[in-house]
């Protein structure tokens, strides 16, 4: 029987493999597609993905978090959740299908109708996999999820690239997204060999929905809050501007989203195991907090410093207007991984009502800031996004720290500022190092080398304690995997 720490370490290790391999493949494919397609096409797909993302959140109905959070889950609760998710997903897709022309009229993009209808099919596949993913997460089995994710990413990438080089246009992106989601769901069923007993319990549904409904509302607000800019930019500006923003955001989220997803998937069950022991809960939370604040800011601040050369080398001259957007969004992206930890803390403490209220407050503040900034100019809007990140961390940190014995918000702010200052210093050196070369590719190469050398120096001589902490958190034990 493995200790929680060893299981957590393995979980985080496989979670990293899952997210970084899957997202890494899609990142590379996205680069190749961006060299063949225009920003306008990416803008259309970006709007479609937002609509599908919000619809998928509704289809989940908060049940996945409810299943993970429960101390024990009966078979009838799994089968009830599966049936509910499929039914809700079917209804949501029907609404999306018939409302697609309305969105096309709103954005004045006729092509949006068939694209939204096609990409919406992925909602059904995502809903069918909710229960299997929840069971695997409860067992901290992220290896199975990683295998399914890697396989689906490779196959969908191959299809997408084949289509784009054979004049597939926008449908190359649509096919890639659909195939990835469908194969991932099918892969989970095949690997787990899980079969459902199609039984339904109204009592079980009512119990799960009591908790899940609050998480659903909060998750829906979060989805709208995270994608609010897509709706606004696409309407107020143009599909091209939205496509440029989308590309910059995807580059910045390559790091931030992976950290956030891994921490949410792994920390939720780990924190749940210790929810009745305040000291252990705080110990796990504090290590994860430092982990996300340090690594997130270190990589993202340096990415902001490399934005010009990175954009030119990776996706070409036509995407250069997105470089300053990337610099700003990379700084903002250091905040979501830390915020996600506080959200998990509230969930494991059973504070779903507070969770929901905080999401309402943050969404309201975000809407106010966007409503003001959008009419000034585009870069004021981006500055407003960074302000939203700071305020969101402050709000979640204030209320989340109330459930920790000694690691209060003041200590968290000190840790955050300490790691952000170190990361800012590294980013400044990385920025200056580009002056040593002439061509963008050589500048980028020097910047990456300088970032790597400085990071190694810091972890070897300055951040020794943090290095040990990262080893304890990240390194999965192969020996323990064999013993499980």
Language-model region placement:
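Helix-loop junctions and terminal segments of transmembrane helices
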Residues: 26, 56-75, 137-138, 248, ...
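Membrane-interface junctions at transmembrane-helix termini in multi-pass inner-membrane proteins
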Residues: 5, 9, 66-75, 125-148, ...
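Membrane-interface helix-loop junctions in multi-pass transport and translocation proteins
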Residues: 32-49, 101, 105, 113-117, ...
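N-terminal membrane topogenesis motif
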Residues: 1-27, 65-83, 143-147, 188-191, ...
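Membrane-proximal transmembrane or re-entrant/amphipathic helices at the cytosolic face
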Residues: 398-401, 409-412, 428-484
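Interhelical loop/hinge segments that connect adjacent transmembrane helices in multipass membrane
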Residues: 1-4, 8, 143, 186-227, ...
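Signature of the first transmembrane helix
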Residues: 4-61, 86-100, 122, 152-161, ...
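Transmembrane helical elements of multi-pass membrane transporters/channels
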Residues: 11-26, 152, 173-180, 184, ...
